[in-house]
């Protein structure tokens, strides 16, 4: 038996400001830190020993994990993987969602955010928001760094890493991942065999641990959120 715990980072500064965040590094708000601490307490109450910790390259997910580990009194190192990053929102990066909807229409914004294979225009490689101009990504091959992504692109990126690096470690081991709305959405599509329509409408709340219990041959026995009050209130960034 093994457990996989998925936690979307706590509320970030740009979540609060309703801006498209994507690969930009923004930290948690005070509320986000509280959410992360609460997530840690919920996980602690499950009495599960975590063998491996994973997070994305992004500060908000890393900070969430560090807070959780502090609550769990765990000093284990965690793996940072850029493949677990949020979806790259291209030229929408940094824009306010409400103002953008007024300019190009709510239907168009909804299409960009929730369609399976439609992506926004590319983010200029001259932009300070582009990963190529961020020191964190200087060791990542340039050809692997996106200018924009669809949810399908995000799914393919996340799943390749998960299947190669994380899933093999799940056999009789427990793993905790802190990541993002769309990268966790991608994992849920794979783990629960969701179709494209189901995955685009799936909401992932901030700071609410999703715990998946696997049995023999990694067959899912049970899946539940640890805080039912937080379901269906969050949106991807």
Question: Which ranges hold each PLM region?
Answer:
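Glycine-rich N-terminal loop/short-helix segment of MobA-like nucleotidyltransferase
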Residues: 11-26
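Residue-level detector of conserved catalytic or cofactor/ligand-binding positions
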Residues: 229-237
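Phosphate-coordination/substrate-recognition cap region in phosphate-metabolizing enzymes
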Residues: 39-131, 137-139, 189-211
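Short catalytic helix/loop segments, enriched in acidic residues and glycine
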Residues: 22-38
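Active-site-adjacent alpha-helix immediately C-terminal to a catalytic or transition-state-stabilizing loop
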Residues: 4, 62, 70, 145, ...
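Active-site glycine-centered loops adjacent to acidic/histidine catalytic or metal-binding residues
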Residues: 9, 83, 180
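Amphipathic, non-transmembrane alpha-helical scaffold segments
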Residues: 29, 33, 54, 58, ...
């Amino acid at each position: 038996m093994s457990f996989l715990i998925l936690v979307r980072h706590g509320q970030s500064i740009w979540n609060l400001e309703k801006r498209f965040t994507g690969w930009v590094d923004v930290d948690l708000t005070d509320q986000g830190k509280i959410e992360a601490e609460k997530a840690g307490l919920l996980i602690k109450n499950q009495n599960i020993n975590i063998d491996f910790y994973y997070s994305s390259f992004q500060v908000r997910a890393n900070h969430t994990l560090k807070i959780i580990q502090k609550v769990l009194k765990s000093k284990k190192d965690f793996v940072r993987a850029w493949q677990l990053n949020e979806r790259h929102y291209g030229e929408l990066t940094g824009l306010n969602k409400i103002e953008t909807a007024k300019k190009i229409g709510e239907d168009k914004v909804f299409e960009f955010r929730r369609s399976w294979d439609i992506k926004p225009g590319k983010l200029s490689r001259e932009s300070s928001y582009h990963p190529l101009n961020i020191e964190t990504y200087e060791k990542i091959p340039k050809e692997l760094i996106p200018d924009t992504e669809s949810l399908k692109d995000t799914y393919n990126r996340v799943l390749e890493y998960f299947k190669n690096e994380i899933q093999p470690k799940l056999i009789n081991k427990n793993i905790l991942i802190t990541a993002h709305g769309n990268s966790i959405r991608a994992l849920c599509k794979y783990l629960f065999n969701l179709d494209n329509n189901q995955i685009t409408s799936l909401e992932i709340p901030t700071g609410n641990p999703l715990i998946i219990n696997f049995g023999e041959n990694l067959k899912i026995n049970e899946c539940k959120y640890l805080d039912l009050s937080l379901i269906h209130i969050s949106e991807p960034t």
